[in-house]
């Protein structure tokens, strides 16, 4: 397993051929690696204490007074800038385990991540709750921020083309089932 911050370097140095790691296809990352077509759209959600004051929020403004965080160098942390008029964006934490511990200890009220990560976290922390903002009540994000792609070495069009060929044959139902399988196989432990 390679740490998140080392994924792109591992691709560039030929340590791995590609990374399938929930990586959003951002223009910044595209300067360093090439991406496949999107394989999944990962909505950004909040994870809060199931019995806490924010367990029943339905839109962002319901987070008034909350202290929130996420992982540094992620879209999840960046979207917290959208709530700083009424909530606190706390210092980023390194792992999901540290975020979960911070919620349990009352140091933060919640954190943001994508839906697959949130589902994985709840498998081992059923006392938490996912807030899935729907119908325009959540974070404003672009496809660039939520479309996940497979990162490959810059210029490796042959590999990207092969990956895209496989992806083109997968229905949305197939993709959802594969993501659910992946989440079930590896509950978030960090």
Model-derived regions: residue spans:
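Acidic, polar ligand-binding/catalytic clefts
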Residues: 1-62, 135-143
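Short helix-initiation/N-cap motifs at beta->coil->alpha
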Residues: 1-9, 55, 91-105, 116, ...
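A ligand-binding cleft/hinge motif common to bilobed small-molecule-binding domains
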Residues: 6, 21-32, 79-82, 109-144
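Hydrophobic residues within well-ordered alpha-helices
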Residues: 11-12, 63, 103-104, 163
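Periplasmic-binding protein-like
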Residues: 41-48, 124-167, 184-190
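Short helix-loop capping/hinge motifs at secondary-structure junctions, enriched
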Residues: 51-59, 91, 155-161
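Short loop->beta-strand "edge-of-pocket" segments that line small-molecule binding or catalytic clefts
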Residues: 58-74
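Ligand-binding clefts/hinges and TM-proximal coupling segments of bilobed small-molecule sensing domains
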Residues: 75-93, 130-134, 161-190
